[in-house]
Protein backbone atom coordinates (compact mmCIF):
# COMPACT_ATOMS: atom_id res chain seq x y z
CA UNK A 1 0.00 0.00 0.00
CA UNK A 2 1.28 3.45 -0.92
CA UNK A 3 1.61 6.38 1.45
CA UNK A 4 0.42 9.98 1.49
CA UNK A 5 2.90 12.85 1.55
CA UNK A 6 2.21 13.32 5.26
CA UNK A 7 2.94 9.66 5.99
CA UNK A 8 6.12 9.70 3.90
CA UNK A 9 7.55 12.71 5.73
CA UNK A 10 6.77 11.21 9.12
CA UNK A 11 8.22 7.83 8.13
CA UNK A 12 11.44 9.39 6.84
CA UNK A 13 11.98 11.40 10.01
CA UNK A 14 11.24 8.38 12.19
CA UNK A 15 13.78 6.29 10.28
CA UNK A 16 11.09 3.86 9.11
CA UNK A 17 10.22 2.51 5.67
CA UNK A 18 6.54 3.13 6.25
CA UNK A 19 4.04 4.27 8.84
CA UNK A 20 0.30 3.75 9.17
CA UNK A 21 -2.43 5.98 10.60
CA UNK A 22 -2.78 5.63 14.35
CA UNK A 23 0.83 4.54 14.83
CA UNK A 24 2.80 6.31 17.56
CA UNK A 25 6.30 7.29 16.43
CA UNK A 26 9.30 9.23 17.66
CA UNK A 27 10.80 11.40 14.94
CA UNK A 28 13.63 13.84 14.38
CA UNK A 29 12.39 17.38 13.74
CA UNK A 30 13.94 19.92 11.39
CA UNK A 31 12.69 23.09 13.06
CA UNK A 32 11.33 23.92 16.53
CA UNK A 33 9.43 27.21 16.74
CA UNK A 34 8.07 29.28 19.62
CA UNK A 35 6.85 32.84 20.11
CA UNK A 36 6.66 35.43 22.87
CA UNK A 37 3.59 33.80 24.44
CA UNK A 38 4.62 30.15 24.24
CA UNK A 39 8.44 30.31 24.40
CA UNK A 40 8.67 31.54 28.02
CA UNK A 41 6.88 28.39 29.18
CA UNK A 42 9.11 26.24 26.97
CA UNK A 43 12.24 27.99 28.25
CA UNK A 44 11.28 27.35 31.87
CA UNK A 45 10.69 23.66 31.10
CA UNK A 46 13.94 23.46 29.12
CA UNK A 47 15.94 24.83 32.05
CA UNK A 48 14.42 22.16 34.32
CA UNK A 49 15.96 19.45 32.13
CA UNK A 50 19.48 20.40 33.17
CA UNK A 51 20.92 19.98 29.68
CA UNK A 52 24.00 21.97 28.73
CA UNK A 53 22.89 23.10 25.28
CA UNK A 54 20.13 23.02 22.68
CA UNK A 55 20.19 20.23 20.12
CA UNK A 56 21.01 22.59 17.23
CA UNK A 57 21.15 26.39 17.47
CA UNK A 58 20.34 26.65 13.74
CA UNK A 59 17.17 24.55 14.03
CA UNK A 60 15.33 26.63 16.62
CA UNK A 61 13.34 29.76 15.78
CA UNK A 62 12.19 32.25 18.41
CA UNK A 63 9.83 34.91 17.09
CA UNK A 64 8.44 37.55 19.50
CA UNK A 65 5.60 38.52 17.18
CA UNK A 66 2.38 38.48 19.22
CA UNK A 67 2.85 41.59 21.33
CA UNK A 68 5.53 43.38 19.32
CA UNK A 69 6.40 46.18 19.84
CA UNK A 70 5.94 45.15 23.48
CA UNK A 71 2.59 46.46 24.68
CA UNK A 72 3.13 46.41 28.44
CA UNK A 73 5.50 45.35 31.22
CA UNK A 74 4.49 41.69 31.16
CA UNK A 75 4.97 41.47 27.39
CA UNK A 76 8.35 43.18 27.72
CA UNK A 77 9.45 40.70 30.38
CA UNK A 78 8.39 37.74 28.24
CA UNK A 79 10.36 39.08 25.27
CA UNK A 80 13.35 39.71 27.52
CA UNK A 81 13.27 36.03 28.47
CA UNK A 82 13.40 35.03 24.79
CA UNK A 83 16.20 37.50 24.12
CA UNK A 84 18.34 36.24 26.99
CA UNK A 85 17.75 32.58 26.08
CA UNK A 86 18.70 33.28 22.46
CA UNK A 87 21.88 35.04 23.57
CA UNK A 88 22.82 32.33 26.06
CA UNK A 89 22.48 29.49 23.55
CA UNK A 90 23.45 31.52 20.46
CA UNK A 91 20.15 30.79 18.71
CA UNK A 92 20.60 31.76 15.06
CA UNK A 93 16.95 32.41 14.25
CA UNK A 94 15.96 34.92 16.90
CA UNK A 95 14.15 37.91 15.42
CA UNK A 96 14.37 41.18 17.32
CA UNK A 97 12.19 44.23 16.67
CA UNK A 98 13.26 45.67 13.33
CA UNK A 99 13.76 42.16 11.94
CA UNK A 100 10.72 40.46 13.42
CA UNK A 101 7.63 39.56 11.44
CA UNK A 102 4.59 37.37 11.96
CA UNK A 103 6.19 33.96 12.45
CA UNK A 104 4.26 31.97 9.85
CA UNK A 105 5.02 34.53 7.14
CA UNK A 106 8.58 35.13 8.33
CA UNK A 107 9.95 31.58 8.44
CA UNK A 108 9.05 30.68 4.83
CA UNK A 109 10.25 34.10 3.65
CA UNK A 110 13.63 33.52 5.31
CA UNK A 111 13.99 29.98 3.94
CA UNK A 112 13.97 28.50 7.44
CA UNK A 113 11.22 25.98 6.61
CA UNK A 114 11.60 23.95 3.42
CA UNK A 115 9.80 21.16 1.53
CA UNK A 116 9.99 17.77 3.21
CA UNK A 117 10.68 19.24 6.63
CA UNK A 118 9.11 18.02 9.84
CA UNK A 119 8.30 21.14 11.84
CA UNK A 120 6.79 21.63 15.27
CA UNK A 121 5.80 24.97 16.67
CA UNK A 122 4.35 26.09 19.96
CA UNK A 123 1.61 27.84 18.02
CA UNK A 124 -1.49 26.26 16.52
CA UNK A 125 -1.05 27.86 13.10
CA UNK A 126 2.29 26.15 12.52
CA UNK A 127 0.33 24.10 9.97
CA UNK A 128 0.85 27.06 7.57
CA UNK A 129 4.14 25.54 6.37
CA UNK A 130 2.30 22.65 4.76
CA UNK A 131 2.01 24.96 1.76
CA UNK A 132 5.71 24.26 1.17
CA UNK A 133 5.21 20.51 1.25
CA UNK A 134 6.38 20.20 4.85
CA UNK A 135 4.60 18.36 7.65
CA UNK A 136 4.11 21.11 10.20
CA UNK A 137 1.99 21.01 13.32
CA UNK A 138 1.39 22.87 16.53
CA UNK A 139 2.48 21.42 19.88
CA UNK A 140 2.43 22.45 23.51
CA UNK A 141 5.29 24.36 25.07
CA UNK A 142 6.48 21.28 26.99
CA UNK A 143 6.90 19.27 23.78
CA UNK A 144 8.72 22.23 22.28
CA UNK A 145 11.06 22.33 25.29
CA UNK A 146 11.92 18.63 24.97
CA UNK A 147 12.50 19.04 21.24
CA UNK A 148 14.82 22.02 21.80
CA UNK A 149 16.92 19.70 23.96
CA UNK A 150 16.70 16.47 21.96
CA UNK A 151 15.71 17.38 18.41
CA UNK A 152 12.92 14.83 18.60
CA UNK A 153 9.19 14.68 19.27
CA UNK A 154 6.50 12.03 19.42
CA UNK A 155 3.69 11.91 16.88
CA UNK A 156 0.56 9.93 16.22
CA UNK A 157 0.37 9.36 12.48
CA UNK A 158 -2.85 11.02 11.25
CA UNK A 159 -5.37 9.85 8.71
CA UNK A 160 -5.51 12.07 5.61
CA UNK A 161 -8.50 13.63 3.87
CA UNK A 162 -7.94 14.62 0.25
CA UNK A 163 -9.62 17.83 -0.91
CA UNK A 164 -9.84 18.31 -4.68
CA UNK A 165 -10.58 21.79 -6.06
CA UNK A 166 -11.54 22.17 -9.74
CA UNK A 167 -13.19 24.74 -12.01
CA UNK A 168 -12.53 28.43 -12.58
CA UNK A 169 -12.39 30.80 -9.62
CA UNK A 170 -14.93 33.60 -9.59
CA UNK A 171 -13.62 37.17 -9.48
CA UNK A 172 -12.34 38.24 -6.04
CA UNK A 173 -12.27 34.63 -4.81
CA UNK A 174 -8.98 33.45 -3.29
CA UNK A 175 -7.51 30.65 -1.21
CA UNK A 176 -9.05 32.27 1.88
CA UNK A 177 -12.54 31.78 0.44
CA UNK A 178 -11.82 28.16 -0.46
CA UNK A 179 -10.65 27.24 3.02
CA UNK A 180 -13.52 29.11 4.69
CA UNK A 181 -15.97 27.36 2.35
CA UNK A 182 -14.35 24.01 3.13
CA UNK A 183 -14.53 24.57 6.89
CA UNK A 184 -18.14 25.67 6.45
CA UNK A 185 -18.79 22.35 4.72
CA UNK A 186 -17.02 19.94 7.09
CA UNK A 187 -17.22 21.90 10.35
CA UNK A 188 -14.63 22.95 12.91
CA UNK A 189 -14.09 19.31 13.89
CA UNK A 190 -14.45 17.86 10.41
CA UNK A 191 -10.78 16.94 10.15
CA UNK A 192 -9.93 16.39 13.80
CA UNK A 193 -6.38 15.04 14.17
CA UNK A 194 -6.14 14.44 10.42
CA UNK A 195 -4.01 15.84 7.65
CA UNK A 196 -5.85 17.90 5.03
CA UNK A 197 -4.21 17.40 1.63
CA UNK A 198 -5.19 20.05 -0.92
CA UNK A 199 -4.93 19.22 -4.64
CA UNK A 200 -6.59 19.89 -7.99
CA UNK A 201 -6.29 22.28 -10.92
CA UNK A 202 -7.22 25.29 -8.79
CA UNK A 203 -4.41 24.53 -6.34
CA UNK A 204 -2.01 23.94 -9.24
CA UNK A 205 -2.63 27.50 -10.43
CA UNK A 206 -2.76 29.11 -7.00
CA UNK A 207 0.10 31.39 -5.88
CA UNK A 208 1.98 30.60 -2.70
CA UNK A 209 0.09 33.30 -0.80
CA UNK A 210 -3.22 31.49 -1.33
CA UNK A 211 -1.67 28.14 -0.45
CA UNK A 212 -0.31 29.56 2.80
CA UNK A 213 -3.79 30.88 3.65
CA UNK A 214 -5.38 27.48 3.07
CA UNK A 215 -2.85 25.48 5.07
CA UNK A 216 -2.86 28.12 7.81
CA UNK A 217 -6.54 27.52 8.52
CA UNK A 218 -6.43 23.71 8.46
CA UNK A 219 -6.35 23.83 12.26
CA UNK A 220 -9.73 25.61 12.18
CA UNK A 221 -11.18 22.32 10.93
CA UNK A 222 -9.38 20.50 13.75
CA UNK A 223 -6.63 19.21 11.48
CA UNK A 224 -3.19 18.12 12.59
CA UNK A 225 -1.74 19.53 9.39
CA UNK A 226 -2.63 21.06 6.05
CA UNK A 227 -0.36 20.06 3.19
CA UNK A 228 0.15 20.59 -0.54
CA UNK A 229 2.47 18.46 -2.69
CA UNK A 230 5.28 20.73 -3.97
CA UNK A 231 5.29 21.73 -7.64
CA UNK A 232 6.99 24.31 -9.88
CA UNK A 233 5.33 27.19 -8.02
CA UNK A 234 6.68 25.84 -4.73
CA UNK A 235 10.16 25.34 -6.12
CA UNK A 236 10.25 28.85 -7.63
CA UNK A 237 9.46 30.22 -4.18
CA UNK A 238 11.91 27.99 -2.34
CA UNK A 239 14.95 28.18 -4.62
CA UNK A 240 15.33 31.90 -3.95
CA UNK A 241 15.37 31.34 -0.20
CA UNK A 242 16.74 27.88 0.66
CA UNK A 243 20.12 27.81 2.39
CA UNK A 244 20.21 24.04 3.00
CA UNK A 245 19.20 20.91 1.09
CA UNK A 246 15.58 19.80 1.06
CA UNK A 247 13.59 16.86 -0.28
CA UNK A 248 10.38 16.79 -2.30
CA UNK A 249 7.77 14.21 -1.31
CA UNK A 250 4.49 13.37 -3.01
CA UNK A 251 1.55 11.08 -2.40
CA UNK A 252 1.46 7.65 -4.02
CA UNK A 253 -1.38 6.94 -6.42
CA UNK A 254 -2.45 4.00 -4.27
CA UNK A 255 -2.23 5.92 -0.98
CA UNK A 256 -5.17 5.33 1.34
CA UNK A 257 -7.33 8.30 2.31
CA UNK A 258 -9.89 8.54 5.08
CA UNK A 259 -12.13 10.48 2.71
CA UNK A 260 -11.98 12.34 -0.60
CA UNK A 261 -13.98 15.53 -1.10
CA UNK A 262 -14.36 17.56 -4.30
CA UNK A 263 -15.37 21.19 -4.80
CA UNK A 264 -16.44 22.98 -7.99
CA UNK A 265 -14.81 26.35 -7.37
CA UNK A 266 -16.81 28.05 -10.11
CA UNK A 267 -19.75 27.85 -7.70
CA UNK A 268 -17.95 29.36 -4.70
CA UNK A 269 -18.45 33.13 -4.25
CA UNK A 270 -16.51 35.40 -1.89
CA UNK A 271 -17.56 34.20 1.56
CA UNK A 272 -17.50 35.46 5.13
CA UNK A 273 -17.32 33.45 8.37
CA UNK A 274 -19.81 34.96 10.80
CA UNK A 275 -19.53 34.93 14.61
CA UNK A 276 -18.56 32.92 16.48
CA UNK A 277 -17.04 30.06 14.48
CA UNK A 278 -14.95 29.85 11.30
CA UNK A 279 -17.50 27.32 10.07
CA UNK A 280 -20.42 29.78 10.19
CA UNK A 281 -19.88 30.68 6.54
CA UNK A 282 -22.20 32.70 4.30
CA UNK A 283 -21.81 34.42 0.91
CA UNK A 284 -20.53 37.96 1.41
CA UNK A 285 -23.34 39.42 -0.68
CA UNK A 286 -25.92 38.11 1.80
CA UNK A 287 -24.47 40.17 4.66
CA UNK A 288 -24.87 43.72 3.35
CA UNK A 289 -27.02 44.60 6.37
CA UNK A 290 -24.10 44.07 8.78
CA UNK A 291 -22.53 47.40 9.77
CA UNK A 292 -18.92 47.34 10.93
CA UNK A 293 -16.72 49.45 13.19
CA UNK A 294 -13.28 48.11 12.28
CA UNK A 295 -11.35 46.39 9.50
CA UNK A 296 -8.13 44.43 10.06
CA UNK A 297 -6.11 43.38 7.01
CA UNK A 298 -3.07 41.32 7.95
CA UNK A 299 -2.16 38.28 10.11
CA UNK A 300 -0.38 35.01 9.35
CA UNK A 301 -3.35 34.16 7.14
CA UNK A 302 -3.48 37.24 4.90
CA UNK A 303 -0.66 39.69 5.61
CA UNK A 304 1.49 38.84 2.59
CA UNK A 305 2.36 41.14 -0.29
CA UNK A 306 -0.29 39.68 -2.59
CA UNK A 307 -2.91 40.33 0.09
CA UNK A 308 -1.83 43.96 0.43
CA UNK A 309 -1.91 44.38 -3.35
CA UNK A 310 -5.46 43.04 -3.40
CA UNK A 311 -6.54 45.46 -0.68
CA UNK A 312 -4.84 48.35 -2.49
CA UNK A 313 -6.71 47.56 -5.72
CA UNK A 314 -9.95 48.10 -3.83
CA UNK A 315 -8.84 51.13 -1.80
CA UNK A 316 -7.06 53.11 -4.53
CA UNK A 317 -8.78 56.46 -4.98
CA UNK A 318 -11.29 55.71 -2.23
CA UNK A 319 -11.70 56.61 1.44
CA UNK A 320 -12.43 54.42 4.42
CA UNK A 321 -15.95 55.08 5.69
CA UNK A 322 -15.86 57.84 8.34
CA UNK A 323 -17.39 55.55 10.95
CA UNK A 324 -14.86 52.75 10.35
CA UNK A 325 -11.29 52.22 11.58
CA UNK A 326 -9.07 50.34 9.14
CA UNK A 327 -5.83 48.75 10.36
CA UNK A 328 -3.43 47.24 7.83
CA UNK A 329 -0.59 45.04 9.07
CA UNK A 330 2.17 43.89 6.68
CA UNK A 331 3.28 40.49 7.97
CA UNK A 332 7.04 41.11 7.76
CA UNK A 333 9.51 43.96 7.34
CA UNK A 334 10.37 42.79 3.81
CA UNK A 335 6.69 42.83 2.86
CA UNK A 336 6.36 46.30 4.40
CA UNK A 337 9.36 47.55 2.41
CA UNK A 338 8.11 46.13 -0.88
CA UNK A 339 4.66 47.59 -0.22
CA UNK A 340 6.36 50.97 0.24
CA UNK A 341 8.27 50.58 -3.04
CA UNK A 342 5.08 49.66 -4.90
CA UNK A 343 3.15 52.62 -3.51
CA UNK A 344 0.71 50.46 -1.56
CA UNK A 345 1.36 52.19 1.76
CA UNK A 346 0.61 55.56 0.15
CA UNK A 347 -2.69 54.18 -1.13
CA UNK A 348 -3.58 52.97 2.36
CA UNK A 349 -2.71 56.25 4.04
CA UNK A 350 -4.53 58.26 1.36
CA UNK A 351 -7.56 56.08 2.06
CA UNK A 352 -7.24 57.05 5.75
CA UNK A 353 -6.23 53.60 6.94
CA UNK A 354 -3.50 53.20 9.54
CA UNK A 355 -0.51 50.96 8.79
CA UNK A 356 0.94 48.98 11.68
CA UNK A 357 4.40 47.44 12.06
CA UNK A 358 4.45 43.65 11.67
CA UNK A 359 2.64 42.09 14.63
CA UNK A 360 -0.11 39.60 15.45
CA UNK A 361 -1.67 42.41 17.48
CA UNK A 362 -5.46 42.53 17.22
CA UNK A 363 -5.85 39.00 15.81
CA UNK A 364 -5.63 37.49 19.28
CA UNK A 365 -7.00 40.50 21.13
CA UNK A 366 -3.48 41.53 22.08
CA UNK A 367 -3.10 45.17 21.09
CA UNK A 368 -3.16 47.54 18.09
CA UNK A 369 -6.92 47.34 17.52
CA UNK A 370 -8.97 45.89 20.38
CA UNK A 371 -12.77 45.88 20.08
CA UNK A 372 -15.08 47.43 22.67
CA UNK A 373 -18.40 46.02 23.81
CA UNK A 374 -20.89 45.80 20.97
CA UNK A 375 -18.36 46.54 18.22
CA UNK A 376 -17.97 44.54 15.02
CA UNK A 377 -14.89 43.93 12.90
CA UNK A 378 -14.32 42.27 9.57
CA UNK A 379 -10.83 40.82 9.45
CA UNK A 380 -8.56 38.72 7.26
CA UNK A 381 -7.51 36.78 10.35
CA UNK A 382 -8.27 33.13 11.10
CA UNK A 383 -10.42 33.00 14.23
CA UNK A 384 -13.63 34.66 15.32
CA UNK A 385 -14.36 32.99 18.66
CA UNK A 386 -16.12 34.88 21.44
CA UNK A 387 -13.81 37.64 22.67
CA UNK A 388 -11.08 36.82 20.15
CA UNK A 389 -10.40 40.46 19.24
CA UNK A 390 -11.45 42.11 22.47
CA UNK A 391 -14.65 42.38 24.48
CA UNK A 392 -16.68 39.15 24.85
CA UNK A 393 -19.68 41.00 23.42
CA UNK A 394 -17.83 42.14 20.28
CA UNK A 395 -18.05 40.28 16.96
CA UNK A 396 -15.50 39.27 14.32
CA UNK A 397 -16.30 38.36 10.72
CA UNK A 398 -13.60 36.63 8.62
CA UNK A 399 -13.02 37.35 4.93
CA UNK A 400 -10.45 37.74 2.20
CA UNK A 401 -8.56 41.07 1.84
CA UNK A 402 -10.68 42.39 -1.05
CA UNK A 403 -13.95 41.91 0.81
CA UNK A 404 -12.45 43.40 3.98
CA UNK A 405 -11.21 46.46 2.08
CA UNK A 406 -14.53 46.96 0.28
CA UNK A 407 -16.39 46.64 3.56
CA UNK A 408 -14.18 49.33 5.05
CA UNK A 409 -15.18 51.74 2.30
CA UNK A 410 -18.87 50.85 2.45
CA UNK A 411 -19.13 50.91 6.25
CA UNK A 412 -20.80 47.51 6.14
CA UNK A 413 -19.99 44.07 4.83
CA UNK A 414 -19.84 44.23 1.05
CA UNK A 415 -17.92 43.18 -2.03
CA UNK A 416 -15.65 44.97 -4.52
CA UNK A 417 -18.38 44.65 -7.16
CA UNK A 418 -20.44 47.14 -5.19
CA UNK A 419 -17.66 49.65 -5.81
CA UNK A 420 -17.70 48.95 -9.54
CA UNK A 421 -14.67 46.67 -9.45
Curated annotation (Swiss-Prot):
Its cofactor is [4Fe-4S] cluster. Pathway: Amino-acid biosynthesis; L-leucine biosynthesis; L-leucine from 3-methyl-2-oxobutanoate: step 2/4. InterPro entries: Acnase/IPM_dHydase_lsu_aba_1/3, Acoase/IPM_deHydtase_lsu_aba, Aconitase_4Fe-4S_BS, Aconitase_4Fe-4S_dom, HAcnase/IPMdehydase_lsu_prok, Homoacnase/IPMdehydase_lsu, IPM_dehydratase_rel_enz, IPMI_cat. Keywords: 4Fe-4S, Amino-acid biosynthesis, Branched-chain amino acid biosynthesis, Iron, Iron-sulfur, Leucine biosynthesis, Lyase, Metal-binding. Its EC number is 4.2.1.33. It comes from the Bacteria. Binds 1 [4Fe-4S] cluster per subunit. One of its GO terms (biological process) is L-leucine biosynthetic process. [4Fe-4S] cluster binds at residues 300, 360, 363. Gene3D superfamilies: Aconitase, domain 3. It catalyses: (2R,3S)-3-isopropylmalate = (2S)-2-isopropylmalate. One of its GO terms (molecular function) is metal ion binding. Belongs to the aconitase/IPM isomerase family. LeuC type 2 subfamily. Catalyzes the isomerization between 2-isopropylmalate and 3-isopropylmalate, via the formation of 2-isopropylmaleate. PANTHER family: 3-ISOPROPYLMALATE DEHYDRATASE LARGE SUBUNIT 2 (PTHR43822:SF16), HOMOACONITASE, MITOCHONDRIAL-RELATED (PTHR43822). Heterodimer of LeuC and LeuD. This is 3-isopropylmalate dehydratase large subunit.
